[in-house]
């Protein structure tokens, strides 16, 4: 998915930096170093995850062994992207309790980007089928770079996935 998105954007003249299969330090450095117009995050999302080596639970995107990209990491970004696409399972999920206990992150990545002022955020509200998620991302970006408005590009991509991937509910996750 990430390679396909990077290719689509590069073919339209966007300056693309990818961190595909990079380690945690490279990912975090790139996230904070550049002023991103479009930020596409693809990976596995976790909610209130804790491994044997972690002292507290974390919610966010897995970016390495026992390393989770959290809303706190996002909050430290110097610049606010215009568009953020988070294609991970569970990352659109909200904690209805609004927990503020030490070490517990009540917010998720999508919510943090919205709080920061990102103009448009796409995030999956539940676990998505990998193939359908990739197809959604490709359909969305194809339309965006062709000049369609954000809402119409999302609607049309959802429709495409509803038709193409009729046995999964991924179309409704975005």
Predicted regions and their residues:
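A domain-level signal for caspase-like cysteine endopeptidase catalytic cores
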Residues: 1-56, 86, 100, 104-108, ...
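Short, structured coil segments at secondary-structure junctions
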Residues: 12, 57, 80, 116-117
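Caspase-like cysteine protease fold
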Residues: 29, 56-80, 128-131, 135-174
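Conserved acidic residues
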Residues: 36-37, 82, 119
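A short, glycine/acidic-enriched catalytic loop
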Residues: 45-79, 91-104
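Acidic, glycine-rich active-site loops and adjacent beta-strand->loop/helix elements
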Residues: 89-91, 127-128
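Conserved short secondary-structure transition element at the edge of the structured enzyme core
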Residues: 106-121
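Short acidic/histidine-rich active-site segments
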Residues: 119-131
